[in-house]
């Protein structure tokens, strides 16, 4: 752990969220079975080492899990120009007015020209429609004899983070997806949810733990680094989210009965916290959120959080620091490294209790 910079200063600078992680700690393969990933339980009083299939022992009857049901699309398309040059197209999101059109990023030896075609197979190709800002393009997808969804499933690859290499592309299509995913739209998985199994849900239900769904389509911004040292100047990326009225009702009933709202992942946290109105009341919501949660933020909905270990200098690490405090986060990450926990998307996870008032002076 980098003791000279990690959590130095007052937490307003990017360098205050840096730490050193040996490459050996970065998980390159998912745990099998899913729920055998390790679980670090973080309370103010200390750290407990557990396993995800023991989550039922850490929750209580009346608790409510909030699950992000977004589904990762196979957004990486590898093709070639008619001339033979190789091209990679990374789909970002569809044009809401024209579903066959997608905002995307491209990688090739020479920039594509408007009107140029990229072929993925005899029955599936893309055509460049427009060049846009930030290196993005608009492409039209064409499938012959099949639907676009079927073509993407057949030819596309899962958009794994750049720190994962040499994985099994076929295995990734099932393992880089939660068992409760149902709404297409993400280009990265809500990784805290990857550890759940149907059998674990049965055990949770038997204990009296319930759950509801929200949707946040994880975007490319989750991979992009923060580029400014002064965090006040960071332009937070936007992501589309939806919180429906039935989920709001379940959350309100849970809190009224003394249960705890357990957000599964930072995406569930952002969805819930960005759906609170100016009077502090949780409301159904739909649209883009750019909520940037960092130390100093006061949580209004979330009582407990499940989340994996996050990259240095990331907004996700800052969100966790806001929830548990920077002092406790430093303790937890040092413990995890010392105990050889597996980090990042395919790695282990944590169950976080919130920062106590008496801890705030330690951060």
Swiss-Prot record:
GO terms for cellular component: cytoplasm. InterPro entries: QueA, QueA_dom1, QueA_dom2, QueA_sf. It is found in: Cytoplasm. The keyword Repeat does not apply. It comes from the Bacteria. Its EC number is 2.4.99.17. Pfam families: Queuosine_synth. Gene3D superfamilies: QueA-like. GO terms for biological process: queuosine biosynthetic process; tRNA wobble guanine modification. Transfers and isomerizes the ribose moiety from AdoMet to the 7-aminomethyl group of 7-deazaguanine (preQ1-tRNA) to give epoxyqueuosine (oQ-tRNA). Belongs to the QueA family. This is S-adenosylmethionine:tRNA ribosyltransferase-isomerase. It comes from Magnetococcus marinus (strain ATCC BAA-1437 / JCM 17883 / MC-1). The lineage of its organism: Bacteria, Pseudomonadati, Pseudomonadota, Alphaproteobacteria, Magnetococcales.
């Amino acid at each position: 752990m980098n003791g000279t910079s990690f959590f130095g200063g007052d937490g307003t600078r990017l360098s205050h969220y840096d730490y050193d992680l040996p490459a050996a700690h970065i998980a390159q393969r998912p745990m099998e079975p899913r729920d055998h990933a390790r679980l670090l339980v973080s309370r103010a009083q200390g750290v407990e080492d557990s396993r995800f299939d023991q989550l039922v022992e850490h929750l209580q009857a009346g608790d409510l899990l909030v699950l992000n049901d977004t589904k990762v699309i196979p957004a990486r398309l590898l093709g070639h120009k008619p001339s033979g040059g190789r091209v990679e197209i990374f789909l970002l999101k569809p044009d809401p007015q024209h579903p066959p059109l997608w905002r995307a990023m491209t990688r090739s030896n020479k920039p594509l020209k408007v009107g140029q075609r990229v072929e993925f197979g005899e029955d599936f190709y893309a055509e460049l429609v427009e060049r846009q800002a930030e290196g993005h393009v608009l492409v039209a997808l064409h499938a012959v004899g099949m639907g676009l969804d079927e073509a993407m499933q057949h030819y596309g690859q899962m958009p794994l983070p750049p720190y994962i290499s040499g994985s099994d592309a076929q295995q990734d299509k099932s393992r880089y997806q939660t068992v409760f995913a149902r709404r297409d739209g993400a280009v990265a998985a809500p990784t805290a949810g990857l550890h759940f199994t149907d059998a674990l849900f049965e055990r949770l239900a038997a204990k009296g733990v319930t759950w509801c769904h929200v949707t946040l389509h994880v975007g490319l911004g989750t991979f992009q680094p923060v580029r400014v040292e002064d965090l006040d100047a960071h332009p937070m990326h936007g992501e589309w989210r939806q919180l429906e009225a039935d989920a709001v009702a379940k959350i309100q009933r849970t809190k009224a009965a003394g249960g705890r709202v357990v957000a599964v992942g930072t995406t569930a946290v952002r969805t819930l916290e960005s759906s609170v109105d100016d009077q502090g009341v949780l409301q159904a919501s739909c649209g883009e959120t750019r909520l940037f949660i960092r130390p100093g933020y006061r949580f209004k909905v979330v009582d407990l959080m499940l989340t994996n270990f996050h990259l240095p200098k990331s907004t996700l690490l800052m969100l966790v620091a806001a929830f548990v405090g920077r002092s406790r986060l430093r303790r937890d990450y040092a413990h995890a490294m010392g105990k050889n926990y597996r980090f990042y998307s395919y790695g282990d996870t944590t169950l976080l209790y919130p920062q106590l008032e008496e801890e705030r002076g330690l951060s």
